[in-house]
From Swiss-Prot:
Keywords: ATP-binding, Cell cycle, Cell division, Cell shape, Cell wall biogenesis/degradation, Cytoplasm, Ligase, Nucleotide-binding, Peptidoglycan synthesis. GO terms for cellular component: cytoplasm. Pathway: Cell wall biogenesis; peptidoglycan biosynthesis. InterPro entries: Mur-like_cat_sf, Mur_ligase_C, Mur_ligase_C_dom_sf, Mur_ligase_cen, Mur_ligase_N, MurCDEF_pg_biosynth, UDP-N-AcMur_Ala_ligase_MurC. It holds the Pfam family Mur_ligase_M. Its EC number is 6.3.2.8. This is UDP-N-acetylmuramate--L-alanine ligase. It comes from Teredinibacter turnerae (strain ATCC 39867 / T7901). PANTHER family: UDP-N-ACETYLMURAMATE--L-ALANINE LIGASE (PTHR43445:SF3), UDP-N-ACETYLMURAMATE--L-ALANINE LIGASE-RELATED (PTHR43445). It is found in: Cytoplasm. Belongs to the MurCDEF family.
Length: 473
């Protein structure tokens, strides 16, 4: 394999030492890893040690636990994310020392500037779609650089430096920082009301920002957009770039159809503007993943990747950590077994997609969900949607809201949400204050044949490994 160039970014020749504040985050760690592999001297800090920080340290990066002013001494630039408070001592010291401080997306934009960038945006499905594109491109011998918001199960990492000109990355709309990116291809999976504080609570502003992002494409660039999403279709007339649509709708350029579920796997066909329909096998359940795969096929076809590579890249895809990650089947002491699944989805639309995937693939099994709401503002803004979707499971254990740095909001906490769901009368939720109390509750309530899903974006992600280790004994 061709070795990637050291210092691939020509205009960053004056930069040697790069420090990441909050390096344990998925997006931050991926960029740090790519820059490290390009030969830059990378350091980073996070509030606590994690599997991610240990992995970065093992690669040779200097990783600090805790944020201290001295950590930025001698560095050339500091990278931070929107999750880092502006009063962070490292940011204050960097500005005091006149060290440039840039956002995560700005650094990603520099990585993309001199490459053929493929940026995947949208409220839901970014990580999986980005991963599927990277998988197809790798199978097609394109050897892409990729930066993904989750761990690729096949690679054990969320980023890699490839030798080709291709860079596949997520474009984060949560803080509007995706406007720093200037890709050649932009994918928009869907547009939903989320992170509305960034947009002043105005959905119109959110939509205009997506249009602005798409106009960062050069005039010869391509926007690949989901033709099933009504918000997206309403914006297409405003996009002064080539648009390729995908979805289940008849008028989409890339149309998925004839979907057949096979116990967590699925087969379907994709009609394309030219050539024969493409037969696809996907090792993941859910119609949302059919859409994600169809977006990846649209991008790959437009970039000239052959059909065999597309089919094999999808068939061999091993999934992404915490995206409907199946831990396996576990026997119960009383006989029978349960299947354990972990999923990152934390918006009502994402939770609904997970539930539908289970219902479609395992229609005769009981769905037992352990859900942790993420952010008080999201719980407040989408309260009724959460009540409706969570009422559709068979057994519900509800945790307190994972604050993610927010202050509690009266009426938007886990206990209040649990009461409202109980009042609707479709499911009787069990509220558990702390995550450490969940295994005992699950053990008492579980029944043979259950599919247990740990769901959410907070520390509920640590629960599935705990349950798997205890084996429900």
């Amino acid at each position: 394999m061709q070795q990637p160039d050291i210092h691939f970014i020509p205009e960053m020749r004056r930069i040697r030492r790069i420090h990441f504040v909050g390096v344990g985050g998925a997006g931050m760690s991926g960029i740090a890893e790519v820059l490290h592999n390009q030969g830059y001297l990378i350091s980073g800090s996070d509030l606590r040690e994690s599997d991610v920080t240990r992995r970065l340290s093992a690669m040779g990066m200097t990783i600090y636990v805790g944020h201290h002013a001295k950590n930025v001494h001698g560095v050339d630039v500091v990278v931070n994310s929107s999750a880092v408070d502006e009063a962070n001592p490292e940011l204050l010291e960097a500005r005091q020392q006149r060290i440039p401080v840039v956002r995560r997306a700005e650094m990603l934009g520099e990585l993309m500037r001199y490459r053929h960038g493929i940026a995947v945006a949208g409220t839901h499905g970014k990580t999986t779609t980005t991963s599927l594109i990277a998988s197809i491109f790798a199978e097609g011998d394109k050897d892409p650089t990729f930066v993904i918001g989750g761990l690729l199960n096949s690679a054990g990492t969320n980023a890699a430096l490839g030798a080709s000109r291709y860079l596949v990355a997520e474009a984060d709309e949560s803080d509007a920082s995706f406007l720093h990116l200037q890709p050649m291809v932009a994918v928009v999976t869907n547009i939903d009301a989320d992170h509305m504080d960034t947009y002043g609570g105005d959905f119109g502003t959110l939509k205009k920002t997506f249009v602005e992002f798409l106009h960062n494409l050069p005039f010869y660039g391509v926007a690949v957009m989901c033709g099933d999403d009504p918000v997206i279709t309403s914006l297409i007339p405003d996009i002064a770039r080539t648009v390729i649509t995908y979805g289940f709708s008849e008028d989409c350029d890339f149309k998925a159809y004839d979907v057949k579920q096979e116990s967590g796997k699925q087969r379907f066909k994709i009609k394309r503007p030219e050539g024969e329909p493409l037969d696809i096998y996907l090792n993941m359940p859910g119609q949302h993943n059919v859409l994600n795969a169809t977006a990846a096929v649209a991008v790959a076809t437009d970039e000239g990747i052959d059909d065999i590579a597309i089919q094999q890249g999808l068939a061999q895809f091993m999934g992404v950590g915490r995206r409907f990650q199946i831990y396996g089947d576990y026997p119960l002491p009383q006989g029978g077994s349960v299947m354990l699944v972990d999923d990152y989805g934390h918006h009502p639309r994402e939770v609904a997609a997970t539930i539908r995937a289970v219902r479609d693939s395992w229609p005769d099994r009981r769905l037992f969900m352990v859900y942790q709401p993420h952010r008080y503002t999201r719980t407040r803004d989408l309260y009724e949607d959460f009540v409706e979707v969570l009422s559709s499971v068979d057994q519900l254990v509800l945790l307190e809201v994972y604050a993610a740095g927010e202050e509690p909001i009266p009426g938007a906490d886990g206990r209040h949400l649990s009461r409202t769901i109980r009042t609707r009368g479709l499911v009787d939720p069990i509220f558990v204050e702390g995550i450490e109390g969940v295994p005992a509750v699950v053990k008492d309530l579980v029944k043979p044949g259950d599919i247990i899903i740990t769901q959410g974006a907070g520390n509920v992600g640590s629960l599935a490994p705990t349950l798997a280790k205890k084996k429900f004994a």
